[in-house]
């Protein structure tokens, strides 16, 4: 289980140890990105669940700095459907498809990898093991090894890949800063989790199982509502979680914010081009409601100890550090609602969902 859920039971050294195999590969992955970038025009991220959260966050950053390549992020099932309808989208040697799955067993991602086996596009896989099903189709594979921190490991490897591509094709001069910053990221993640323990306990004290919880974020910070709100709180406990993009907040959603509802709102404010959107949302809550009328909290992705992390890289990894800050909230919320971190899932892993419909 992720060490960040209970930072008091571990240490920054243990955190780094769990990510050792990843840290050792950062430069190799970046080098692969640089070498591959010279002959591509498109980068297509393909994943599901937390991997898709990573992909979308990276795309938000490439949208800001990219000029010469096209970057897209697809849910694996959507990508498979598109390939079936239009196989030519991957029969192009100037396209790089980036596949990721922590387990290496996600069925729609595995099917995408199988479909790509004999296609002209370039491909790369990020997963736990080179022996996984996802890695069995001959694609270049980078593996995290056995680790409690698979989510962070895959994010770090994929970010290194993108750093190499941006360096080669987008005149991005921050690759050395990225690699050095990622080397110290495990310590920053651990410190953020330590910082999150008491706020998590305080939040859990006013939370109930039937309270809706809204995560509002923008830009690269969109990874936080998806990875923590959906992939942890909703998946493990069945809580009613809603994720809202800051750009959409004032278009209908704002009307759901009412004092009579027992809802909670967590605002994640990034340090990227989308920051003004979230500052507008924060201003709405500050100006429209008196203290205590609405349960809302503001978390700045810049509000954590980032010792050794380049400030410009902090804009990219800040959301991951913010997600680490929230991780200890999960066991606190579980205890407050009579659940545990080890409760079995109700449906996931028990229903063979992919392509289960009648032909």
From Swiss-Prot:
It holds the Pfam family SIS. Keywords: Plasmid. Gene3D superfamilies: Glucose-6-phosphate isomerase like protein, domain 1. It comes from the Bacteria. One of its GO terms (biological process) is carbohydrate derivative metabolic process. Residues 28-171 form the SIS domain. One of its GO terms (molecular function) is carbohydrate derivative binding. This is Agropine synthesis conjugase. It comes from Rhizobium rhizogenes.
């Amino acid at each position: 289980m992720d060490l960040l859920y209970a930072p008091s039971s571990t240490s920054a050294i243990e955190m780094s140890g769990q990510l050792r195999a990843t840290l050792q590969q950062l430069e190799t992955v970046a080098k692969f990105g640089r070498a591959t970038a010279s002959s591509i025009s498109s980068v297509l991220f393909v994943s599901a669940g937390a991997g898709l959260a990573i992909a979308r966050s990276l795309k938000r950053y490439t949208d800001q700095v990219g000029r010469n390549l096209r970057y897209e992020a697809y849910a694996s099932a959507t990508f498979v459907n598109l390939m079936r309808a239009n196989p030519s989208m991957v029969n192009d040697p100037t396209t790089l498809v980036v596949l990721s799955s922590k387990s290496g067993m996600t069925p729609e991602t595995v099917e995408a990898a199988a479909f790509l086996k004999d296609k002209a596009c370039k491909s790369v896989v990020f997963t736990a093991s080179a022996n996984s099903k996802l890695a069995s189709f001959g694609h270049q594979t980078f593996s995290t090894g056995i680790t409690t921190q698979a989510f962070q490991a895959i994010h770090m490897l994929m970010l290194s890949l993108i750093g190499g591509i941006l360096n080669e094709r987008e005149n991005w001069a921050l690759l050395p800063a990225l690699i050095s910053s990622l080397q110290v990221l495990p310590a920053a993640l651990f410190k953020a989790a330590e910082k999150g323990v008491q706020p998590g306990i305080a939040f859990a004290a006013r939370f109930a199982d039937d309270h809706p919880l809204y995560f509002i974020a923008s830009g690269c910070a969109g990874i936080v509502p998806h990875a923590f709100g959906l992939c942890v709180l909703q998946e493990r406990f069945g809580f009613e979680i809603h994720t809202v993009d800051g750009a959409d907040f004032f278009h209908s959603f704002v009307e759901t914010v009412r004092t009579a509802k027992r809802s909670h709102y967590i605002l994640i404010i990034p340090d990227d081009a989308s920051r003004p959107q979230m500052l507008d949302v924060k201003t709405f809550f500050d100006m429209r409601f008196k203290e205590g009328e609405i349960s809302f909290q503001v978390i700045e992705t810049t509000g954590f100890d980032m010792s050794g992390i380049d400030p410009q890289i902090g804009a990219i990894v800040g959301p991951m550090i913010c997600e680490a800050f929230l991780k200890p909230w999960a066991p606190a919320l579980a205890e407050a609602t009579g659940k545990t971190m080890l409760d079995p899932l109700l449906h996931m892993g028990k229903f063979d969902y992919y392509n289960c419909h009648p032909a």
